[in-house]
């Protein structure tokens, strides 16, 4: 049994997690923006890592979802290989993807089709979750199977239960703005075990935390104007929170990933931050973030058309 001091020591060590500064390209990175081959990506956005370290990618400009298995040289198309439209087998501008374990299905946000769909890969059918008056971006799902959807142009996040027609407002919805009860183009989101919702408030250059049933959020990263100091963010995108409550955010226009601890005035650069570029220690508009079960960090390096893996330093 661990003593209190040992537990604290372990937590302190975890808080000091470092990552290799030179990323490994694990998907894409084989050509220009218009690359449609199976070894290419075009402006990847949301990602998630399966238990077997397969990477699922919203390959946005190729209008498809692709799966890259561990150590694979190319991906396989999971959804959307039939052109960009709104039919069952088509996608148009997929931005994020999550997996619903209870229903063994993927949840996909499609910006240009203004819909979120539940996609069953085995029989290649889908069900529409939202109505057509949304502009869906980031997705999250809780242990009850409720789906959270960031609506970038309605400046709100809604929670959708099975059969909902409009969803339930859980954050924002008070017009576009920078007050604590407002959002300004929310992009990616993360739901914690206590149902606190973390939102990349893109045009306010901050990450907001909305506790369950809260009427307003609190700033947990950024919020000091647009900039590149350690107190600032510049159009945040992907956001994930670890088991210690540390917030990892893709600081997109600063081409870096930052880590913030709630209550602290500034964050720290975890990877990137070496200028816009395509070297292994550089990023170019990072988007989605995800961890594997070993704690390695994956970044959708969108304008380099690749997924970068930054290994944890043990």
Kindly give the residue locations of the regions a language model identified.
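Blade-level signature of beta-propeller repeat domains, shared across WD40, Kelch, NHL, RCC1
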Residues: 284-314
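Hydrophobic/aromatic beta-strand positions that recur at structurally equivalent sites within the blades
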Residues: 68, 99, 116-120, 160, ...
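Short loop/turn segments immediately following the C-termini of beta-strands
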Residues: 52, 60, 102, 111, ...
């Amino acid at each position: 049994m661990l003593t209190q001091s040992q537990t604290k020591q372990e937590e302190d060590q975890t808080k000091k997690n470092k990552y290799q500064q030179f990323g490994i390209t694990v998907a894409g990175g084989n050509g220009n923006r218009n690359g449609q081959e199976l070894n290419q990506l075009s402006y990847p956005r949301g990602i998630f890592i399966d238990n077997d370290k397969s990477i699922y990618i919203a390959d946005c400009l190729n209008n498809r979802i692709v799966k890259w298995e561990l150590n694979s040289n190319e991906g396989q198309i999971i959804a959307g290989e039939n052109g960009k439209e709104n039919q069952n087998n088509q996608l148009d501008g997929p931005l994020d993807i999550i997996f619903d374990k209870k229903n063994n299905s993927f949840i996909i946000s499609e910006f240009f089709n203004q819909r979120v769909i539940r996609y069953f890969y085995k029989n290649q059918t889908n069900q529409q979750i939202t109505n057509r008056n949304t502009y869906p971006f980031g997705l999250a799902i809780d242990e009850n199977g409720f789906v959270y959807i960031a609506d970038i142009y309605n400046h709100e996040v809604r929670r959708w239960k099975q059969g909902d027609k409009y969803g339930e407002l859980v954050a924002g919805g008070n017009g576009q703005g920078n007050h604590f009860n407002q959002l300004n183009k929310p992009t990616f989101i993360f739901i914690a075990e206590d149902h606190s919702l973390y939102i990349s408030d893109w045009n306010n250059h901050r990450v907001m935390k909305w506790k369950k049933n809260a009427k307003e959020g609190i700033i947990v990263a950024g919020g000091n104007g647009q900039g590149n100091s350690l107190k600032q963010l510049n159009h945040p995108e992907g956001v994930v929170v670890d088991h210690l409550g540390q917030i990892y955010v893709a600081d997109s226009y600063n081409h870096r990933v930052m880590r913030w601890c709630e209550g602290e005035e500034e964050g720290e650069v975890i990877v990137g931050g070496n200028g816009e570029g395509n070297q292994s220690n550089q990023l170019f508009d990072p988007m989605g973030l995800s961890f594997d079960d070993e704690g390695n960090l994956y970044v959708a390096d969108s304008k380099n058309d690749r997924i970068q893996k930054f290994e944890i330093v043990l």
